[in-house]
């Protein structure tokens, strides 16, 4: 039975508050993704406003 057993080892390191992606901590990656998402959303809002104005001008 000992050959079929599975051991799970959980190691906690309190020095690193965030998991790391390569050399950058996850907090930097989260800020990068948040910045890109913000830029995308702002661009989407601007394009929506422009298209609504063009559509309104075309219909009126």
Swiss-Prot record:
Location(s) in or outside the cell: Host membrane
Signal peptide: none
Xref: Pfam families: UL2
Annotated Gene Ontology cellular component terms: host cell membrane; membrane
Main location: host cell
Membrane topology listed for this record: Single-pass membrane protein
Spans through the membrane: 33-55
Ranges in coiled-coil conformation: none
Keywords linked to the UniProt accession: Host membrane, Membrane, Transmembrane, Transmembrane helix
Family membership noted in the UniProt record: Belongs to the HHV-5 UL2 protein family.
Name the record gives this protein: Uncharacterized protein UL2
